[in-house]
Amino acid sequence: IWNGHRARCRHRCLILSRAAYLGAQKYGTTFWSSDVYPEWDVLKRQIPTALNFCASGMPYWSSDIGGWQPLPDTESGEDYNSLLIGTSSTGTQVKKQNYAELYIRWFQFGAFCPTFRTHGTRKHNEVWSYGEKAEQILVKYLKLRYSLMPYIYSLAYQTTRTGAPFMRALWMDFPEEECARLQDEFMFGPAFLIAPVVECGQTQRRVYLPQGADWVDYWTGRHYRGGRWILAQAQMDCIPIFVRAGSIIPVGEDVESLQTEQKQIEARVYPGADCSFTLYSDDGKTYDYEKGVYDTLELRWDDCSKRLTANGTALPLEWCGKTIMTKVVVIDTENKENTECVTDA
């Protein structure tokens, strides 16, 4: 498939596969965890599955958000709990009436996977298919994923250069014993620590924040020292997200799809340490990047002077047809609020 596509097409090839072997990642392949069941325990298993798979050198992975198999009381009538050998931690059987909660939690997890895709045998599978409350939450995370595309696409560039996955187990960044045992948290690039909710009815969960860094609650701006367990709030619309202090996160403007280029990019800086981030851009469609047709921009934060520069130049600037950093948002973790530093356009 890859050879034929390269020979005949100018645009990039993407292959979705569930069969993997060493070296398959060089053929534009993303993998998924097969036709999984819509169960809470199955959602829980997706996290270690993803981390082990990505650690093997296959950086692009996904799952069928919400599960692929039909619900037992809708299409098939099959009782498939027996196939899971009674491993569900809550014993709650997912049915049509309570499925929306599982779908929301799976969707939140999927928004921080290398490949974000929803799929299944359900007749309706749009964000508005599960009620108004669910729609509002799903749209929130869909917009969040799109806003992070400058960050995510730049991570993909680093993966191409180094082979290191950007969805990775905590021990890859923090080689400590506590992190080596964790299977339900992960890093999404150098900045984000993600702690998905995988229990029915759960509104808070324990989260370990690794030592060697300070951490900031993405939703509240609250600052935490590393090397400790905390009890994080996890209401239905909230997946616990923590940002490593000393991070730069490029954020794109709202778009309905990636067919629309994000021409306005702002920087969100989480102070606490000197840091840098390489922003990457190409045409997003062809293989011209293999010929060197791409651009990078080195963003650097000096924590002492509280100054952000790009390739050593003060912001804002025009780069690759984009207006970069007309606004720099520095997260004030001491006062638990955001401080907007607006540069002169």
Give residue ranges: language-model regions.
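A short, sequence-level motif marking secondary-structure junctions
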Residues: 230, 344-345
